[in-house]
Amino acid sequence: MGSDTIADIITSIRNADMYRKSVVRVASTNISQSIVKILLREGFIENVRKHRENNKSFLVLTLRHRRNRKRTYRNLLNLKRISRPGLRIYSNYQRIPRILGGMGIVILSTSQGIMTDREARLERIGGEILCYIW
């Protein structure tokens, strides 16, 4: 775990999906809870539960996988960190990119909290582009 909690969450989920793990454990922070809530609402993960161990809180995520698949495995989740500590990327609501023509989502940090691109366009507010998920 480094100092960039968003990158840690994205990397943990991406690695677990790549190796077909069904459960991921990430550190519980306000930002991670907001991002996980969006992933759960959009259907990218199945379940979330809180776990406490040695006075540290964790979120235990259950990933969504295709079961009984015989062919080669393709990742179901594609996550990409955009704005990072060394290079912040901001966008107004008109220039928020559309991922796969609206099939994917963009997670933004706005003055109203962390939200998806669709919510930001409806609210007509921009913000920092945290990551793409498709």
Swiss-Prot record:
InterPro entries: Ribosomal_uS8, Ribosomal_uS8_CS, Ribosomal_uS8_sf. GO terms for biological process: translation. Disulfide bonds: none annotated. GO terms for cellular component: chloroplast; ribonucleoprotein complex; ribosome. It is found in: Plastid, Chloroplast. Part of the 30S ribosomal subunit. Belongs to the universal ribosomal protein uS8 family. PANTHER family: 40S RIBOSOMAL PROTEIN S15A. This is Small ribosomal subunit protein uS8c. It comes from Lactuca sativa (Garden lettuce). The lineage of its organism: Eukaryota, Viridiplantae, Streptophyta, Embryophyta, Tracheophyta.
